[in-house]
Amino acid sequence: MRDRASRPGREGARGCAIGRAARRFAAERRGTSGIEFALIAPILLLLLLGGTTVFTLVRDSRTAERATYTVSDLLSRSTTKPDLNASHALFLAITRHAAADVRFRVTSVKKVKDKMVIDWSRAQAPEAPLADLAPLSAKLPVVADGDSILLVETSLTSRPLFSYLGLTDQTFAYLSANRPRFVPALPAPD
């Protein structure tokens, strides 16, 4: 006589029906591309928006760096009083940012008796003229006694295209130090 567990009954038939339904479901291919698209599309969109945002931030950083070195080189070639308004306007034109997002300062520094001394410093609002060289001392190049250098400091605040991805405003700050090429020191601008 068979015992109860080995007898085919309702539980065995139900298990067999569930197995057949599971096999039919696994073999079914209709609608899978729609489900795959629904799962992958948000990820692709996030990658596209994130890539575009990161590219824009890197482009802004590189442009600000190039603009800083361009303005610094232009000022170092000057033989007369520099026009800082024109230099600031050139920086804004190269970076294509609003003046509110940009800080701009030009400082002439001389080395007198083994000490760096500020000759003059001018800045565009809201930046203030440089009063103390101590924060920049580690970034200054080696200068011969009696020589001068021209420091151009800029910073640019860039806003991400899609800030809801967790990125916040980025500030890119650059310092360029050049020796005046044709004169010992640039005269102070008006």
What is each model feature region?
Residues 2-92:
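Alpha-helical assembly-interface signal, strongest on the long, hydrophobic N-terminal helix that forms
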